[in-house]
Amino acid sequence: MCGNGSRCATLLAHKLGMAPAEHLMLTDAGTVHAQVFSEAGEVEVQLTPVRDVALNFSLDLGGTSFTAHFANTGVPHTVIIADDVKALDIKGLGALVRYHAHFAPAGTNANFIQILGREELLLRTYERGVENETYACGTGAAASVAVAHALGLCEAKARVTTSGSEMLEITVRGTDIFLRGKAQLVYQGEFSPAALGL
């Protein structure tokens, strides 16, 4: 499940005339409600319900104990709150979280957040599969706001700035969570499976 990928697929399906501005999308994680806001150049998806939330547990990462939190927003996300996310070694710490025995065998994505205010967070994410920092993780942003809101650190609606400077808006309503942000078509081409021997 990829939150930002869902937003992009929503926009493309609408632009190609395959779906109306508001529609449902089937994913491996479940059904996602999606809506294109053409005038704003934004797309919002309602992710699958937040589940498996766990707050305030300790993780030993390379001999240092961190307070961690967890939420599944279609994929598993661990969230660690930091005073300065820019100062962190995301690749090193992220790998320790991702492969920690606590999350075996599937592993987890690792999100490091900095609370800037009641409606604003900074986010850096280490994604499993990529095995490195990525610059805009939508499901990670959603999990981060879900956790911060559950801890009373932010409002139910908050803006998340990713390390790639992407601004995402997350809204929590109970276990329902919404991801909204800019989306634009940047390339169109043709794919030839035969050229790849498929």
Where are each of the predicted segments found?
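Active-site proximal loop and beta-alpha junction motif in alpha/beta enzyme cores
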Residues: 1-136, 143-198
